[in-house]
Design a protein with these regions (language model features):
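A short beta-strand submotif of the Rossmann-like class I SAM-dependent methyltransferase core
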Residues: 68, 93, 156-160
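Short beta->alpha hinge that forms the Motif I/post-I loop of the SAM-binding pocket
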Residues: 96, 117
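Conserved coil-to-alpha-helix start sites within the AMP-binding
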Residues: 97-101
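Structured binding elements
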Residues: 109
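N-terminal "arm"/small-domain region of PLP-dependent enzymes with the aminotransferase-like
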Residues: 1-43
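Phosphate-binding glycine-rich loop
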Residues: 46-90, 104-106, 114-116, 138-150
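Active-site phosphate-binding strand-loop segment of PLP-dependent enzymes
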Residues: 120-161
């Protein structure tokens, strides 16, 4: 199965060579900005560049505010809190995902519920989600989505790339 998956991904990217997860790409002022950041002594979660980044994201998205987070897990955690995920709630996500997805759900006290991925995209399958919701979920009189099998609230759906 492992070899089949690797071949599938290699075919998708049109190569049998190593496919890096993250390849750095420097195309402009990165070195200059890194030196400025180091010299400012603000190299972590605060400083001029963080402030500028947050303002740029807010402006670009049309949001009133934007915040930079330390990593993707903390960003997902905040998003789930804002979505109303609480202890004993369920969150639908895909079966092929990074551990951060489930960690963020558990940090809120929730439980991940897995649906299958789309073979063409490796993202959450809309068909699998539709099938799951039709078979297992209902909107009750309280206006919330409930899993009939577990009798728990489904408070979010978290598709990942």
């Amino acid at each position: 199965m492992y070899k089949n998956f690797v071949w599938f991904v290699q075919d998708l990217y049109g190569t049998r060579d190593f496919i890096p997860l993250h390849a750095p790409r420097f195309i402009g002022n990165e070195k200059k900005y890194l030196i400025e950041t180091i010299e400012s002594t603000f190299v972590s979660s605060v400083g001029e560049f963080v402030d500028r980044f947050e303002l740029s994201v807010a402006e670009y998205t049309g949001a009133k505010y934007a915040i930079a987070t330390v990593n993707g897990t903390s960003a997902l955690h905040i998003a789930l809190i804002l979505a109303g995920v609480q202890k004993d709630h369920e969150v639908i996500t895909q079966s092929l995902t990074f551990v951060a997805t489930c960690n963020a759900i558990r940090y809120c006290g929730g439980t991940p519920v897995f649906v299958d991925v789309d073979k063409a995209t490796l993202g959450l399958s809309a068909k699998s989600l539709e099938d799951f919701l039709q078979e297992h979920a209902e909107i009750r009189n309280d206006g919330l989505c409930w899993n009939n099998g577990s009798n728990k609230i489904i408070s979010a759906c978290l598709p990942m790339h």
